[in-house]
């Protein structure tokens, strides 16, 4: 089992292109099933949206390839990364 705080300190990397996407800022949980639906990244600080807030990137749980000691590997198509 892993705690949310342990989950949040891991870097998220796209295995499709090797790019570091950032770290987890939040998670989306289905309250009916109690399962994680998606992880939400706060962005890498390069893209600022409205009022200077970082853009969020929502990654569905099914796109997670592997959760390792220091990194979470995800598979995303190029437009997302």
Swiss-Prot record:
Domain of life: Bacteria
GO BP term (any one): sporulation resulting in formation of a cellular spore
Keywords for the protein's UniProt record, in alphabetical order: Sporulation
Entry keyword annotation includes Phosphoprotein: no
Induction: Expression is regulated by the sporulation transcription factor sigma E.
Changes seen on gene knockout: Inactivation of the gene does not affect sporulation, but a ylmC/ymxH double mutant shows a 100-fold reduction in the efficiency of sporulation.
Cited SUPFAM superfamilies: PRC-barrel domain
A Pfam family matched in the record: PRC
Record-stated family: Belongs to the YlmC/YmxH family.
PANTHER family: SPORULATION PROTEIN YLMC-RELATED (PTHR40061:SF1)
Protein name: Probable sporulation protein YlmC
Protein species of origin: Bacillus subtilis (strain 168)
Lineage, opening ranks: Bacteria, Bacillati, Bacillota, Bacilli, Bacillales
Gene behind the chain: ylmC
